[in-house]
Every structure is written in C-alpha cells, then in structure tokens.
Amino acid sequence: MNRNTMDIYKILKQLPHRYPFLLVDRVLAIDKGKSIRAVKNVTINEPFFQGHFPYRPVMPGVLMLEALAQAAALLAFDAIDTTPDEDSVYYFAGMDGVRFKRPVEPGDQLILEVELVRMKAGIFKFKARALVDNELAVEAELTCAVRKIA
C-alpha cells in the first residue's frame, strides 16, 4: 500500500473508534503535517438513520463534524509520528465557523478534507470541509488536543 494512503486496517490501528462510531473508511491521500483527504461511505445501514429521519434519512451534522475530527486525528498522529495508546486520549476540543451547506443522504460518499493550520504543545488547529459530488456539505475550523491520561 502507498505510504500516503490508509485502508481500514491501518485506520483501525490509528483510531480507537469502532462500529458504529468509526466514521472514516479510507484515506485517499495524506501529506505529512499538512493535509489529509479521506472517505466516509454513507449507507442506509447506518444506525442513526433509524431515527434521523425515518421518512427522509439525513446524516446528522454533528456526525459529519465527528468524521472530520477523526480524519484530523489521523493527520495529527501522522504529523507527530505516533500511534495512540491506552495512556493517551485525543479530544475534540472545539469548533468555529461551522456551516452546513447540503444534506448528506444514504448512498452519498462524503469526502473529508482537513488541513493542519497549527500545532503546539499537543493542541491542533485544523481547517476542515466535507464534500459530496464536489459540492460542499459542511465546513468548520476544528481544535483538537492529545493528552496523556496515565
């Protein structure tokens, strides 16, 4: 496999999330310390579609942001050459400028694009957006932090 991509097995080694909360299916490209482009394939089998909404399934906006935060985590871990362990945790610490532009529905492929803006002392700032068919679905500035817990 290309060093600049990740399949689901590599993602599972880098993220603690598991079904139904793992929201990154593949990394298409990663430019160390700069940016990542990843995919979330949205299917009708997603558990959140049972109640959001039964008559017209739409991916909750907070889960689009979570998918972006998970892609950001992959970028952060790659930037600092680390694999998370049981003694550390990666927090989604904040978001600014969030704008939802279009609904995401079953069958859509959510392309996650995250750019690392700044990192200092375990705090990471990102500019993030997600697209469907080259159309902006959501954009935000994300703040995340890596902390030792042991």
From Swiss-Prot:
Keyword flag Lipid biosynthesis: yes
Localisation per UniProt entry: Cytoplasm
Reactions catalysed: a (3R)-hydroxyacyl-[ACP] = a (2E)-enoyl-[ACP] + H2O
A biological process from GO: lipid A biosynthetic process
Keywords, comma-separated and alphabetical: Cytoplasm, Lipid A biosynthesis, Lipid biosynthesis, Lipid metabolism, Lyase
Keyword Cytoplasm: yes
Active site annotation, chain numbering: H52
Annotated Gene Ontology cellular component terms: cytoplasm; membrane
E.C. designation(s): 4.2.1.59
GO MF entries: (3R)-hydroxyacyl-[acyl-carrier-protein] dehydratase activity
Pfam families named in the record: FabA (PF07977)
Major localization listed first in the record, in broad terms: cytoplasm
Cystine connections: none
Chain's role: Involved in unsaturated fatty acids biosynthesis. Catalyzes the dehydration of short chain beta-hydroxyacyl-ACPs and long chain saturated and unsaturated beta-hydroxyacyl-ACPs.
Homology family: Belongs to the thioester dehydratase family. FabZ subfamily.
Designated name of the protein: 3-hydroxyacyl-[acyl-carrier-protein] dehydratase FabZ
Organism field: Albidiferax ferrireducens (strain ATCC BAA-621 / DSM 15236 / T118) (Rhodoferax ferrireducens)
Name of encoding gene: fabZ
